[in-house]
């Protein structure tokens, strides 16, 4: 990462007005606060809410490592005087940092399969396995918050959009604004996709999955999708992301005010 990322370019982009701000979120293991470390334009002030706070700083690779440090799988990372872990932990408002940094549009890359959440539940013939239970617990931590926050944002947009500036000020909502969103979600379940790459796991891990019945149980790939870092699976994820984005190419170009592709 140190070889690939040039953090000095963040400073340059902010100085030139090309970048409003950049934030990286991690969870403080000492107090459980979701902490957003950021670099931004001078008018962006630090914020603090219940169990959420921000810290202006010079971003480094350490902030990235802390933000992606899955508990029990990767060690916590020390930033200043505290240790931090995965940014999705305790992040009840994942869209908030970008909005507070000045975003008026949010391009959201989801990891939860798109589709109707209210479709008929598949019939379960066996009790859930340990990895299946663990997978649902991880989904509750890493997936549910962004979907819930997006629904909240859509309700706020519906409230704010009909009002003009004077009406917003009279209602005490002068700082509120409509935030446009575009979500790109996987067209396939990552849990089921992960099951196709079980053979890439170390033998000891495959043995554990076999003994717990996880390989043959529908929906048991949830936990596996969080711990599978093998090349084949990662490459397939990138390919799926590209395919799903190209499937919405016109929506993406419209969202970013880009000219349509020529025929």
Regions found by a protein language model. Name each.
Residues 1-263:
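Patatin-like phospholipase
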